[in-house]
Amino acid sequence: MSSSLEQLKATGTTVVSDSGDFASIGKYKPQDATTNPSLILAASKKAEYAKLIDVAIDYAKQKGGPIDQQVDDALDRLLVEFGKEILKIIPGKVSTEVDARYSFDTEASVNKALHLIELYGEQGISKDRILIKIAATWEGIKAAEILQRDHGINTNLTLMFSLVQAIGAAEAGAYLISPFVGRILDWFKASTKKEYSKEEDPGVQSVKTIFNYYKKYGYNTIVMGASFRNTGEITELAGCDYLTISPNLLEELLNSNEPVPKKLDASQASSLDIEKKSYINDEALFRFDFNEDQMAVEKLREGISKFAADAVTLKSILKEKLA
Protein backbone atom coordinates (compact mmCIF):
# COMPACT_ATOMS: atom_id res chain seq x y z
CA MET A 1 0.00 0.00 0.00
CA SER A 2 1.49 3.35 -0.97
CA SER A 3 1.59 6.18 1.56
CA SER A 4 -1.17 8.77 1.78
CA LEU A 5 1.37 11.28 0.43
CA GLU A 6 2.00 9.19 -2.69
CA GLN A 7 -1.75 8.64 -3.12
CA LEU A 8 -2.32 12.40 -2.86
CA LYS A 9 0.21 12.95 -5.65
CA ALA A 10 -1.53 10.22 -7.68
CA THR A 11 -4.81 12.20 -7.65
CA GLY A 12 -3.05 14.79 -9.81
CA THR A 13 -2.25 17.19 -6.98
CA THR A 14 1.22 18.76 -7.08
CA VAL A 15 2.67 18.70 -3.56
CA VAL A 16 4.50 21.82 -2.39
CA SER A 17 6.53 22.24 0.80
CA ASP A 18 5.53 25.15 3.05
CA SER A 19 8.71 25.86 4.98
CA GLY A 20 11.84 27.96 5.20
CA ASP A 21 13.54 25.02 6.92
CA PHE A 22 14.96 23.61 3.69
CA ALA A 23 17.08 20.97 5.42
CA SER A 24 13.86 19.14 6.32
CA ILE A 25 11.96 19.07 3.02
CA GLY A 26 13.95 16.90 0.61
CA LYS A 27 12.60 13.53 1.70
CA TYR A 28 9.01 14.44 0.77
CA LYS A 29 10.06 15.11 -2.84
CA PRO A 30 7.94 18.25 -3.27
CA GLN A 31 7.76 19.88 -6.70
CA ASP A 32 7.79 23.46 -5.40
CA ALA A 33 8.28 25.29 -2.11
CA THR A 34 6.69 28.32 -0.48
CA THR A 35 8.18 30.68 2.08
CA ASN A 36 6.86 33.70 3.95
CA PRO A 37 8.37 36.14 6.48
CA SER A 38 7.11 34.05 9.43
CA LEU A 39 8.70 30.85 8.08
CA ILE A 40 11.99 32.60 7.26
CA LEU A 41 12.01 34.13 10.76
CA ALA A 42 11.51 30.70 12.35
CA ALA A 43 14.24 29.13 10.22
CA SER A 44 16.68 32.00 10.73
CA LYS A 45 16.71 31.30 14.48
CA LYS A 46 18.25 27.87 13.84
CA ALA A 47 22.03 27.60 14.02
CA GLU A 48 22.36 25.75 10.72
CA TYR A 49 21.04 28.78 8.80
CA ALA A 50 23.42 31.32 10.39
CA LYS A 51 25.65 31.28 7.30
CA LEU A 52 22.77 32.58 5.16
CA ILE A 53 22.35 35.53 7.49
CA ASP A 54 26.11 36.14 7.31
CA VAL A 55 25.94 36.31 3.50
CA ALA A 56 23.05 38.80 3.70
CA ILE A 57 24.85 40.97 6.26
CA ASP A 58 28.08 41.02 4.23
CA TYR A 59 26.12 41.98 1.12
CA ALA A 60 24.36 44.86 2.86
CA LYS A 61 27.58 46.15 4.43
CA GLN A 62 29.31 46.16 1.05
CA LYS A 63 26.46 48.14 -0.48
CA GLY A 64 26.62 50.62 2.39
CA GLY A 65 24.30 53.58 2.82
CA PRO A 66 22.06 54.53 5.77
CA ILE A 67 21.38 51.76 8.29
CA ASP A 68 17.70 51.37 7.32
CA GLN A 69 18.71 50.90 3.70
CA GLN A 70 21.26 48.30 4.75
CA VAL A 71 18.59 46.45 6.75
CA ASP A 72 16.28 46.40 3.72
CA ASP A 73 19.12 45.19 1.51
CA ALA A 74 20.02 42.46 4.01
CA LEU A 75 16.40 41.27 4.24
CA ASP A 76 16.00 41.09 0.47
CA ARG A 77 19.25 39.19 0.13
CA LEU A 78 18.29 36.83 2.98
CA LEU A 79 15.00 35.96 1.23
CA VAL A 80 16.95 35.24 -1.94
CA GLU A 81 19.55 33.15 -0.08
CA PHE A 82 16.79 30.96 1.35
CA GLY A 83 15.20 30.70 -2.08
CA LYS A 84 18.52 29.78 -3.67
CA GLU A 85 19.14 26.96 -1.18
CA ILE A 86 15.58 25.64 -1.54
CA LEU A 87 15.95 25.56 -5.34
CA LYS A 88 18.92 23.20 -4.95
CA ILE A 89 16.52 20.67 -3.39
CA ILE A 90 13.34 21.01 -5.47
CA PRO A 91 12.90 20.70 -9.25
CA GLY A 92 10.28 23.45 -9.55
CA LYS A 93 9.65 26.96 -8.27
CA VAL A 94 10.05 28.77 -4.97
CA SER A 95 7.70 31.50 -3.73
CA THR A 96 9.38 34.56 -2.23
CA GLU A 97 7.20 37.10 -0.47
CA VAL A 98 7.18 40.87 -0.91
CA ASP A 99 7.26 42.71 2.44
CA ALA A 100 3.66 42.90 3.69
CA ARG A 101 4.01 46.61 4.43
CA TYR A 102 3.64 47.16 0.68
CA SER A 103 0.27 45.37 0.63
CA PHE A 104 -1.60 48.59 -0.18
CA ASP A 105 0.95 50.05 -2.61
CA THR A 106 0.88 48.68 -6.15
CA GLU A 107 3.95 50.56 -7.37
CA ALA A 108 6.11 49.64 -4.35
CA SER A 109 5.07 45.98 -4.68
CA VAL A 110 6.04 45.95 -8.35
CA ASN A 111 9.38 47.63 -7.65
CA LYS A 112 10.21 45.25 -4.79
CA ALA A 113 9.31 42.27 -6.99
CA LEU A 114 11.55 43.50 -9.80
CA HIS A 115 14.38 44.00 -7.30
CA LEU A 116 14.00 40.46 -5.89
CA ILE A 117 14.04 39.00 -9.41
CA GLU A 118 17.17 41.06 -10.14
CA LEU A 119 18.85 39.67 -6.99
CA TYR A 120 17.96 36.12 -8.02
CA GLY A 121 19.39 36.86 -11.47
CA GLU A 122 22.69 37.92 -9.88
CA GLN A 123 22.79 34.44 -8.32
CA GLY A 124 22.24 32.84 -11.72
CA ILE A 125 18.60 31.96 -11.03
CA SER A 126 16.14 32.74 -13.81
CA LYS A 127 12.77 34.32 -13.12
CA ASP A 128 10.92 31.26 -14.37
CA ARG A 129 11.87 29.46 -11.13
CA ILE A 130 10.49 32.20 -8.89
CA LEU A 131 6.98 33.12 -7.82
CA ILE A 132 6.62 36.54 -6.24
CA LYS A 133 4.17 36.31 -3.35
CA ILE A 134 1.91 39.30 -2.78
CA ALA A 135 -1.11 39.69 -0.50
CA ALA A 136 -4.39 39.55 -2.45
CA THR A 137 -5.49 43.11 -1.69
CA TRP A 138 -6.86 45.24 -4.54
CA GLU A 139 -3.41 46.85 -4.84
CA GLY A 140 -1.69 43.46 -4.72
CA ILE A 141 -3.92 42.06 -7.46
CA LYS A 142 -3.12 45.10 -9.61
CA ALA A 143 0.61 44.63 -8.93
CA ALA A 144 0.31 41.01 -10.05
CA GLU A 145 -1.45 42.13 -13.23
CA ILE A 146 1.47 44.48 -14.07
CA LEU A 147 4.15 41.91 -13.20
CA GLN A 148 2.53 39.18 -15.30
CA ARG A 149 1.59 41.34 -18.28
CA ASP A 150 4.51 43.75 -18.55
CA HIS A 151 7.43 41.83 -17.05
CA GLY A 152 6.63 38.14 -17.49
CA ILE A 153 7.12 37.63 -13.76
CA ASN A 154 4.98 34.92 -12.20
CA THR A 155 3.04 35.77 -9.06
CA ASN A 156 1.48 33.93 -6.15
CA LEU A 157 -1.41 35.91 -4.66
CA THR A 158 -1.62 34.94 -1.02
CA LEU A 159 -3.72 35.62 2.08
CA MET A 160 -6.75 34.67 0.01
CA PHE A 161 -9.94 34.07 1.97
CA SER A 162 -12.73 34.74 -0.52
CA LEU A 163 -14.00 34.08 -4.03
CA VAL A 164 -13.97 37.85 -4.63
CA GLN A 165 -10.17 37.92 -4.23
CA ALA A 166 -9.84 34.76 -6.33
CA ILE A 167 -11.86 36.20 -9.22
CA GLY A 168 -9.76 39.38 -9.22
CA ALA A 169 -6.57 37.30 -9.21
CA ALA A 170 -7.69 35.15 -12.14
CA GLU A 171 -8.68 38.21 -14.16
CA ALA A 172 -5.27 39.74 -13.38
CA GLY A 173 -3.62 36.67 -14.92
CA ALA A 174 -1.86 35.61 -11.71
CA TYR A 175 0.17 32.43 -12.20
CA LEU A 176 -1.05 30.95 -8.92
CA ILE A 177 -3.21 31.74 -5.89
CA SER A 178 -2.96 30.55 -2.29
CA PRO A 179 -6.45 30.28 -0.78
CA PHE A 180 -6.06 29.65 2.96
CA VAL A 181 -7.89 26.78 4.65
CA GLY A 182 -6.90 26.51 8.30
CA ARG A 183 -7.19 30.21 9.08
CA ILE A 184 -10.77 30.19 7.77
CA LEU A 185 -11.55 27.22 10.03
CA ASP A 186 -9.97 29.09 12.97
CA TRP A 187 -12.28 32.06 12.41
CA PHE A 188 -15.45 29.98 12.16
CA LYS A 189 -14.58 27.88 15.22
CA ALA A 190 -13.98 31.05 17.25
CA SER A 191 -17.10 32.71 15.85
CA THR A 192 -19.58 29.82 16.14
CA LYS A 193 -17.96 27.84 19.01
CA LYS A 194 -18.64 24.80 16.83
CA GLU A 195 -16.48 21.89 15.74
CA TYR A 196 -16.42 21.04 12.03
CA SER A 197 -15.83 17.69 10.35
CA LYS A 198 -13.36 17.68 7.48
CA GLU A 199 -16.30 17.50 5.06
CA GLU A 200 -17.98 20.57 6.62
CA ASP A 201 -14.74 22.53 7.10
CA PRO A 202 -15.46 26.07 5.82
CA GLY A 203 -11.83 26.48 4.69
CA VAL A 204 -12.11 23.33 2.58
CA GLN A 205 -15.42 24.57 1.15
CA SER A 206 -13.82 27.92 0.23
CA VAL A 207 -11.05 26.24 -1.81
CA LYS A 208 -13.56 23.92 -3.50
CA THR A 209 -15.68 26.91 -4.53
CA ILE A 210 -12.66 28.75 -5.96
CA PHE A 211 -11.40 25.60 -7.74
CA ASN A 212 -14.80 24.97 -9.34
CA TYR A 213 -15.18 28.61 -10.42
CA TYR A 214 -11.76 28.60 -12.11
CA LYS A 215 -12.37 25.30 -13.87
CA LYS A 216 -15.88 26.21 -15.01
CA TYR A 217 -14.73 29.48 -16.57
CA GLY A 218 -11.44 28.18 -17.97
CA TYR A 219 -8.94 30.20 -15.96
CA ASN A 220 -5.36 28.91 -16.09
CA THR A 221 -4.37 30.35 -12.71
CA ILE A 222 -3.21 27.49 -10.46
CA VAL A 223 -5.21 26.93 -7.26
CA MET A 224 -2.85 26.04 -4.41
CA GLY A 225 -4.61 25.32 -1.12
CA ALA A 226 -2.56 26.57 1.85
CA SER A 227 -2.61 26.91 5.65
CA PHE A 228 -3.66 23.49 6.91
CA ARG A 229 -4.51 22.53 10.49
CA ASN A 230 -4.71 18.76 9.95
CA THR A 231 -4.34 16.09 7.26
CA GLY A 232 -8.13 15.78 6.93
CA GLU A 233 -8.27 19.23 5.34
CA ILE A 234 -5.57 18.13 2.90
CA THR A 235 -7.13 14.82 1.86
CA GLU A 236 -10.53 16.53 1.38
CA LEU A 237 -8.82 18.65 -1.30
CA ALA A 238 -7.16 15.75 -3.15
CA GLY A 239 -7.24 16.62 -6.83
CA CYS A 240 -6.72 20.36 -6.24
CA ASP A 241 -4.05 21.71 -8.62
CA TYR A 242 -1.42 22.23 -5.89
CA LEU A 243 -1.40 21.96 -2.09
CA THR A 244 1.34 23.56 0.00
CA ILE A 245 1.92 21.61 3.18
CA SER A 246 4.14 22.08 6.25
CA PRO A 247 6.80 19.43 6.96
CA ASN A 248 4.99 18.09 10.06
CA LEU A 249 1.84 17.35 8.02
CA LEU A 250 3.91 15.99 5.11
CA GLU A 251 5.46 13.61 7.65
CA GLU A 252 2.01 12.48 8.83
CA LEU A 253 0.93 11.81 5.24
CA LEU A 254 4.17 9.95 4.53
CA ASN A 255 3.62 7.68 7.55
CA SER A 256 -0.06 7.03 6.83
CA ASN A 257 -1.59 4.44 4.52
CA GLU A 258 -5.13 5.82 4.74
CA PRO A 259 -6.75 5.85 1.30
CA VAL A 260 -6.81 9.25 -0.45
CA PRO A 261 -9.48 9.27 -3.16
CA LYS A 262 -9.75 12.21 -5.57
CA LYS A 263 -12.25 14.78 -4.25
CA LEU A 264 -11.88 17.71 -6.66
CA ASP A 265 -12.45 17.08 -10.35
CA ALA A 266 -12.08 19.83 -12.94
CA SER A 267 -14.18 17.91 -15.48
CA GLN A 268 -17.25 18.11 -13.22
CA ALA A 269 -17.08 21.87 -12.71
CA SER A 270 -18.56 22.77 -16.10
CA SER A 271 -22.00 21.49 -15.10
CA LEU A 272 -22.11 23.47 -11.84
CA ASP A 273 -24.38 26.49 -11.51
CA ILE A 274 -21.95 29.27 -10.57
CA GLU A 275 -22.54 32.92 -11.43
CA LYS A 276 -19.74 34.65 -13.35
CA LYS A 277 -18.53 37.95 -11.94
CA SER A 278 -15.89 40.50 -12.90
CA TYR A 279 -13.87 42.82 -10.68
CA ILE A 280 -10.63 43.69 -12.44
CA ASN A 281 -11.95 46.99 -13.84
CA ASP A 282 -14.25 47.84 -10.94
CA GLU A 283 -12.37 48.63 -7.76
CA ALA A 284 -15.50 49.90 -5.97
CA LEU A 285 -17.40 46.66 -6.60
CA PHE A 286 -14.38 44.58 -5.55
CA ARG A 287 -14.07 46.50 -2.31
CA PHE A 288 -17.81 46.36 -1.56
CA ASP A 289 -18.22 42.64 -2.26
CA PHE A 290 -15.06 41.82 -0.32
CA ASN A 291 -16.21 43.99 2.57
CA GLU A 292 -19.44 41.96 2.79
CA ASP A 293 -17.37 38.95 3.94
CA GLN A 294 -16.51 39.63 7.58
CA MET A 295 -14.27 36.58 7.93
CA ALA A 296 -12.22 37.45 4.84
CA VAL A 297 -11.81 41.09 5.88
CA GLU A 298 -10.66 40.17 9.38
CA LYS A 299 -8.34 37.38 8.25
CA LEU A 300 -6.71 39.48 5.52
CA ARG A 301 -6.08 42.28 8.01
CA GLU A 302 -4.65 39.86 10.56
CA GLY A 303 -2.50 38.05 7.99
CA ILE A 304 -0.93 41.23 6.62
CA SER A 305 -0.31 42.50 10.14
CA LYS A 306 1.33 39.22 11.25
CA PHE A 307 3.58 38.94 8.20
CA ALA A 308 4.56 42.60 8.55
CA ALA A 309 5.34 42.15 12.26
CA ASP A 310 7.51 39.10 11.56
CA ALA A 311 9.36 41.04 8.86
CA VAL A 312 9.99 43.80 11.44
CA THR A 313 11.35 41.20 13.90
CA LEU A 314 13.57 39.78 11.19
CA LYS A 315 14.81 43.27 10.35
CA SER A 316 15.62 43.97 14.00
CA ILE A 317 17.76 40.80 14.09
CA LEU A 318 19.55 41.95 10.94
CA LYS A 319 19.95 45.49 12.29
CA GLU A 320 21.72 44.17 15.41
CA LYS A 321 24.13 42.21 13.24
CA LEU A 322 24.79 45.23 11.01
CA ALA A 323 25.59 47.51 13.96
UniProtKB/Swiss-Prot annotation:
Optimum pH is 7.5. Pathway: Carbohydrate degradation; pentose phosphate pathway; D-glyceraldehyde 3-phosphate and beta-D-fructose 6-phosphate from D-ribose 5-phosphate and D-xylulose 5-phosphate (non-oxidative stage): step 2/3. It catalyses: D-sedoheptulose 7-phosphate + D-glyceraldehyde 3-phosphate = D-erythrose 4-phosphate + beta-D-fructose 6-phosphate. The keyword Methyltransferase does not apply. Optimum temperature is 40-45 degrees Celsius. It comes from the Eukaryota. SUPFAM superfamilies: Aldolase. Pfam families: TAL_FSA (PF00923). Its EC number is 2.2.1.2. One of its GO terms (molecular function) is transaldolase activity. CDD domains: Transaldolase_TalAB. One of its GO terms (cellular component) is cytoplasm. The keyword tRNA processing does not apply. Keywords: Pentose shunt, Schiff base, Transferase. The active site is at K133 (schiff-base intermediate with substrate). GO terms for biological process: D-xylose catabolic process to ethanol; pentose-phosphate shunt, non-oxidative branch. Transaldolase important for the balance of metabolites in the pentose-phosphate pathway. Involved in xylose fermentation to ethanol. Belongs to the transaldolase family. Type 1 subfamily. Monomer. This is Transaldolase. It comes from Fusarium oxysporum f. sp. lycopersici (strain 4287 / CBS 123668 / FGSC 9935 / NRRL 34936) (Fusarium vascular wilt of tomato).
